Amino acid sequence: MNAYRLYLVTDDQQDLPTLKHVVRKAVEGGVTMVQVREKHGDVREFIERAQAVKTILEGTGVPLIINDRVDVALAVDADGVHLGQSDMPAEIARQLIGPNKILGLSIETEDQLAEADSLPIDYIGLSAIFATPTKTNTKKHWGIGGLKMALNTTSLPIVAIGGINETNIPALSATGVHGLALVSAICHAENPTKAAEYLLSLMD
């Protein structure tokens, strides 16, 4: 199974009951990976939210990824970590989490892309494909053309992130990209189960 296919990134603006509801329903709809992202809260709150999501995911086969914080990933024994370019270097993160955890890295420029294959990572998050309200400090927008170029450049699986929604999923899927990461299209949906099912149907 391709675990990257429909990659849910949680919304750190949602309270804990909403977060749990979204994750539970999204997994019922076919989400294949969940990344808990916390940019504003304290570490204790991050651990609490990550632990709550881990409990929901137990027995589902859906991996739990922690955004940025290796310490939080270790604290809850998550399945992996996703690093940004300003986070801990990938080599150090790999030493800390060991050889069997999933390690992802955000790639924002062509120079970073060129180096990716030499790093001890499992996948890259290509950011941002399109403009997005959830991330305003992006270095560039790759677009479909940039995504195709990236797929030809690296041997690593690519998860596309940034501005992905029902209107552009068919074109993105046609590139052969390994996965699509979404926040708003699932977290803000009235029914996250139906949203996930619908988004998956657009990938076929």
From Swiss-Prot:
Pathway in which the depicted protein is active: Cofactor biosynthesis; thiamine diphosphate biosynthesis; thiamine phosphate from 4-amino-2-methyl-5-diphosphomethylpyrimidine and 4-methyl-5-(2-phosphoethyl)-thiazole: step 1/1
Record has Metal-binding as a keyword: yes
CDD domains per the UniProt record, alphabetical: TMP_TenI
GO biological process, one term: thiamine biosynthetic process
E.C. designation(s): 2.5.1.3
Residues that bind 2-[(2R,5Z)-2-carboxy-4-methylthiazol-5(2H)-ylidene]ethyl phosphate: T132, P133, T134, G163, V183, S184
GO MF term list: magnesium ion binding; thiamine-phosphate diphosphorylase activity
Keywords: Magnesium, Metal-binding, Thiamine biosynthesis, Transferase
Binding site for 4-amino-2-methyl-5-(diphosphooxymethyl)pyrimidine: Q35, V36, R37, E38, K39, N67, S106, K135
SUPFAM superfamilies documented for this protein: Thiamin phosphate synthase
UniProt keyword Lipid metabolism present: no
Source organism, top-level taxon: Bacteria
Entry function: Condenses 4-methyl-5-(beta-hydroxyethyl)thiazole monophosphate (THZ-P) and 2-methyl-4-amino-5-hydroxymethyl pyrimidine pyrophosphate (HMP-PP) to form thiamine monophosphate (TMP).
Protein family according to the UniProt entry: Belongs to the thiamine-phosphate synthase family.
Classification via HAMAP family: TMP_synthase (MF_00097)
Protein name: Thiamine-phosphate synthase
Taxonomic classification: Bacteria, Pseudomonadati, Pseudomonadota, Gammaproteobacteria, Vibrionales
